[in-house]
């Protein structure tokens, strides 16, 4: 997969993508990440990329032409079609479902805004989709782009050392539940012990415990997800069991 990122700070994206899963994806040739700076396509001695908004008001707006020329260069660099995605708090929320859709693409272009935003005409004519990583405002789209790169990279075949790791993540699977708790060594600690069932070697019992915990954790923390999960009879039974076993004060 190839991801092109248009940003006034492409080195920021490169640094974020140099480590961990995304860095490994690039090393293995499973992800190609390329940064593009619209300032390099701006005209004049100052290579200006922003100006004051028509109608007045605070802040500056990114200009059409540097962005358009930069996008032209991006599209000329690879003949494969690629959706142009603008990172914006007004966009479609980034979910695991959307991440899986994006991960199937051979290529995409991410556009990072700055200042008060981008000239609306560029968004209307050049952008195919706007994506939001949350209901808050950042200084620019770079952090959002880094999130998209990470979530998409880890879904590429061969990136994770254990393919089951992604399949068991929160929001994965057809019902999109939260993940169950995980434990490692030591088995006994001052802060608590590992549940006996996880040390039993009984794979069926372990699978049942994990499913129950996943259902229960979703009910406690994201009950809205259960409304869309369409739980079957056995899952409803496990959730009822979780509720009965819940200690007073654990509803957090």
Swiss-Prot record:
S-adenosyl-L-methionine binds at residues 113, 133-138. GO terms for cellular component: cytosol. It catalyses: guanosine(37) in tRNA + S-adenosyl-L-methionine = N(1)-methylguanosine(37) in tRNA + S-adenosyl-L-homocysteine + H(+). It is found in: Cytoplasm. Pfam families: tRNA_m1G_MT (PF01746). InterPro entries: Alpha/beta_knot_MTases, tRNA_m1G_MeTrfase_C_sf, tRNA_m1G_MeTrfase_TrmD, tRNA_m1G_MTases_N, tRNA_MeTrfase_TRMD/TRM10. Keywords: Cytoplasm, Methyltransferase, S-adenosyl-L-methionine, Transferase, tRNA processing. Homodimer. Specifically methylates guanosine-37 in various tRNAs. This is tRNA (guanine-N(1)-)-methyltransferase. It comes from Xanthomonas axonopodis pv. citri (strain 306). The lineage of its organism: Bacteria, Pseudomonadati, Pseudomonadota, Gammaproteobacteria, Lysobacterales.
């Amino acid at each position: 997969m190839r991801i092109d990122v248009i940003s006034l700070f492409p080195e920021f994206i490169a640094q974020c993508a140099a480590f961990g899963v995304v860095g490994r994806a690039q090393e293995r040739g499973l992800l190609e990440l390329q940064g593009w700076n619209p300032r390099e396509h701006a005209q004049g001695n100052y290579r200006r990329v922003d100006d004051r908004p028509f109608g007045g008001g605070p802040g500056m707006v990114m200009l059409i032409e540097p962005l358009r020329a930069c996008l032209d260069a991006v599209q000329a660099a690879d003949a494969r079609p690629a959706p142009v995605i603008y990172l914006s708090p007004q966009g479609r929320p980034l979910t695991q479902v959307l991440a899986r859709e994006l991960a199937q693409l051979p290529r995409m272009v991410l556009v990072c805004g700055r200042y008060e935003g981008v000239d609306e005409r560029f968004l209307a004519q050049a952008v195919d989709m706007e994506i939001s990583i949350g209901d808050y405002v950042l200084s620019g789209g770079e952090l959002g782009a880094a999130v998209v790169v990470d979530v998409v990279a880890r879904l590429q075949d061969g990136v994770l050392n254990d393919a089951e790791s992604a399949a068991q993540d929160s929001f994965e699977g057809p019902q999109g539940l939260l993940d169950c708790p995980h434990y490692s060594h030591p088995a006994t600690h001052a802060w608590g012990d590992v549940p006996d069932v996880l040390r039993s070697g009984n794979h069926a019992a372990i699978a049942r415990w994990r499913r129950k915990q996943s259902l229960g954790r979703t009910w406690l923390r994201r009950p809205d997800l259960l409304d869309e999960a369409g739980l079957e009879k056995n899952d409803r039974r496990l959730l009822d069991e979780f509720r009965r076993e819940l200690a007073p004060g654990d509803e957090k």
